[in-house]
């Protein structure tokens, strides 16, 4: 009985943590954030390393990054308009999102990969101390 109670308690805690994480993810405007680490850069800036995983066509709110972002494809396919034209990226490739480039939301002519396509990406971005690495545009 002790083992069942402990397992049940762990399951409830896991569900609550998952729900809290999902709620934060919804507030932040990104889909699929599964981990995020922040590293101090000489006390003046922070380096964010974030892993995302999602299936289907990504829907992110319109936003920009005050400091540029590097996105690395761990697995799957994604597309970016960062070069000025839609480009498709797959496992092992990467792209750079320039500082202050507004993107996300309903992008015209966005490449579609379908509901069965899953992807994992690693986003690496910096920000000045006290500033958010991502700013959402209303």
Task: Please annotate each region the language model reported.
Residues 1-4:
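Positively charged n-region of N-terminal signal peptides that target proteins for export
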Residues 6, 15-51, 114, 132-138:
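A short, N-terminal "cap"/entry segment at the start of jelly-roll beta-barrel domains
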Residues 42-43, 64, 72, 87-88, ...:
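Extracellular/periplasmic catalytic domains that process cell-envelope and extracellular macromolecules
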Residues 57-69:
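A short beta-loop-beta micro-motif enriched in histidine and acidic residues
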Residues 67-84:
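Glycine- and acidic-residue-biased ligand/ion/polar-headgroup-sensing regions
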Residues 100-132:
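Ligand-binding loop in jelly-roll beta-barrel domains
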């Amino acid at each position: 009985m002790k083992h069942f109670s402990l397992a049940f308690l762990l399951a409830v805690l896991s569900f609550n943590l998952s729900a809290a994480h999902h709620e934060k993810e919804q507030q932040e405007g990104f889909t699929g954030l599964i981990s995020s680490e922040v590293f101090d850069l000489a006390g003046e800036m922070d380096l964010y390393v974030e892993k995302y995983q999602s299936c289907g066509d990504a829907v992110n709110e319109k936003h920009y990054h005050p400091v540029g972002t590097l996105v690395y494809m761990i697995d799957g396919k994604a597309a970016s308009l960062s070069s000025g034209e839609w480009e498709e990226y797959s496992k092992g490739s990467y792209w750079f999102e320039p500082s202050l480039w507004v993107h996300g939301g309903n992008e015209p002519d966005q490449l579609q990969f379908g509901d069965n396509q899953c992807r994992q990406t690693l986003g690496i971005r910096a920000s000045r101390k006290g500033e958010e690495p991502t700013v959402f545009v209303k």
